[in-house]
Amino acid sequence: MAAIDGLPPLRDVIQRHGLDAKKSLGQNFLFDLNLTQKIARTAGPLDGVTVIEVGPGPGGLTRAILSLGAKKVIAVERDSRCLPVLAEIEAHYPGRLEVIEGDALKTDFEALVPAGEPVRIIANLPYNVGTQLLVNWLLPREWPPFWLSMTLMFQKEVGQRIVAEEGDNHYGRLGVLAGWRTVSEMAFDVPPQAFSPPPKVTSTVVHLLPKDKPLPCDVAKLERVTEAAFGQRRKMLRQSVKSLGGETLLEKAGIDPTRRAETLSVEEFVTLANCL
């Protein structure tokens, strides 16, 4: 398809550099630049904003973000094969793209941006690290976080877990952590054929906004409670949280011990954590 930013079509770029997506890195390349623009627009206004991107690959989404006016993109890429392609984008947008070769799970993202700078996180996350990265971004001790919003692509099943509420089959630890500190929504689905190679599942773009004042709670305690409760989700709470105090803890929190984890609201999980 024709380029929309003055750079060559992505398929041509990938072919010229002999790039193919590596399954071991959880890569799936997006070719459709109209689709990458749709993802970037979902994030909200980009003028004057620094964008953090993880796993840019050949830079389809990077190009969309820059073409929509982002002040700067800081992209963390583990695959050195992609660096020459990203260097071409960097040359096309002088001073607006910084590429860091490294492991996103070991990166201190907040340290990459000057304090007080408006930041949005936009990424087609590698499938094998996406969930852990999200949890890392959701659970800093200080809140509000350094980011204004997160617009992230996941496998659809993961997206459903992020936005799920109590009573939903997809509700679990991820839904509690996301629901505690953010307002999240599934923006739109992306079919397998949009990628190369096509994954076996549909993907979805999730948009998250931080809550100004989430309910006060110790991060570590909330993690302990959700891990215990959903670790044995089919059992009654008196059994699943037995290691944390069982019925004594539940009585203190005012929660019926015969209930199961998936019936508890985010607020009830926070109460439970605060009673530890």
Curated annotation (Swiss-Prot):
Pfam families (alphabetical): RrnaAD
Xref: InterPro entries: KsgA/Erm, rRNA_Ade_diMease-like_C, rRNA_Ade_Mease_Trfase_CS, rRNA_Ade_methylase_Trfase_N, rRNA_adenine_dimethylase, SAM-dependent_MTases_sf
Keyword Nucleotide-binding: no
UniProt-listed Enzyme Commission number(s): 2.1.1.182
The UniProt record lists the keyword Phosphoprotein: no
Catalyzed chemical reaction(s): adenosine(1518)/adenosine(1519) in 16S rRNA + 4 S-adenosyl-L-methionine = N(6)-dimethyladenosine(1518)/N(6)-dimethyladenosine(1519) in 16S rRNA + 4 S-adenosyl-L-homocysteine + 4 H(+)
Residue numbers binding S-adenosyl-L-methionine: 28, 30, 55, 77, 103, 124
Keyword annotations from UniProtKB, A to Z: Cytoplasm, Methyltransferase, RNA-binding, rRNA processing, S-adenosyl-L-methionine, Transferase
Gene3D superfamilies assigned: Ribosomal RNA adenine dimethylase-like, domain 2, Vaccinia Virus protein VP39
Cellular component terms (Gene Ontology): cytosol
Compartments reported by the entry: Cytoplasm
Transmembrane segments: none
Gene Ontology MF terms: 16S rRNA (adenine(1518)-N(6)/adenine(1519)-N(6))-dimethyltransferase activity; RNA binding
Family to which this protein belongs: Belongs to the class I-like SAM-binding methyltransferase superfamily. rRNA adenine N(6)-methyltransferase family. RsmA subfamily.
Function: Specifically dimethylates two adjacent adenosines (A1518 and A1519) in the loop of a conserved hairpin near the 3'-end of 16S rRNA in the 30S particle. May play a critical role in biogenesis of 30S subunits.
UniProt xrefs under PANTHER family: DIMETHYLADENOSINE TRANSFERASE, DIMETHYLADENOSINE TRANSFERASE-RELATED
Protein name: Ribosomal RNA small subunit methyltransferase A
